[in-house]
Amino acid sequence: MRIGHGYDVHRFGEGDHITLGGVRIPHRFGLLAHSDGDVLLHALSDALLGAAALGDIGKHFPDTDPQFKGADSRALLRHVLAQVQAKGYVVGNVDATIVAQAPKMAPHIERMRALIAADLQVELDQVNVKATTTEKLGFTGREEGIAVHAVALLVRP
């Protein structure tokens, strides 16, 4: 068994939606990023890579590489899974916490879980996503961006 932790942050910028867990969520801002800015999938990818001792997403998908400009983070997550599987691991479970003052995540969490489970080739009950605020404290509380913490458990079958 191996565990990994991932953390990612993206700041808000111009836009009319954000993408989290593969779900497009209407919002008065977008997230600034080289890829599609899916901070949830980036944190999950880092957790999986960390658990398998494969580095981080910056190593695998550098923001200096034009090939990843606007990249679909679901495709990146599936690529990460393939690397993890190549080392003989399968996903035991993943758990993520979205830290954001807005928008409200509750209406979107079940769809996020379903998409993540599909991409990771696991059952829905092996994926947990939750959200919290910082009670208007810090950069997330001032609605300057979104942060996500994620953990992953990998097992060898």
UniProtKB/Swiss-Prot annotation:
Keyword match Acyltransferase:
no
Single GO molecular function: metal ion binding
Instruction: Give the required cofactors.
Output: a divalent metal cation
Chain sites annotated for binding 4-CDP-2-C-methyl-D-erythritol 2-phosphate:
8-10, 34-35, 56-58, 61-65, 100-106, 132-135, 139, 142
Q: Where is this site: Transition state stabilizer?
A: H34, T133
- GO BP terms in the entry: isopentenyl diphosphate biosynthetic process, methylerythritol 4-phosphate pathway; terpenoid biosynthetic process
Q: Which NCBIfam families match?
A: ispF (TIGR00151)
Task: Extract the HAMAP family matched here.
Answer: IspF
Reported function: Involved in the biosynthesis of isopentenyl diphosphate (IPP) and dimethylallyl diphosphate (DMAPP), two major building blocks of isoprenoid compounds. Catalyzes the conversion of 4-diphosphocytidyl-2-C-methyl-D-erythritol 2-phosphate (CDP-ME2P) to 2-C-methyl-D-erythritol 2,4-cyclodiphosphate (ME-CPP) with a corresponding release of cytidine 5-monophosphate (CMP).
**Quaternary state and partners of this protein?**
Homotrimer.
Q: What is this protein called?
A: 2-C-methyl-D-erythritol 2,4-cyclodiphosphate synthase
Please tell me the species this chain comes from.
Stutzerimonas stutzeri (strain A1501) (Pseudomonas stutzeri)
Q: Which gene encodes it?
A: ispF
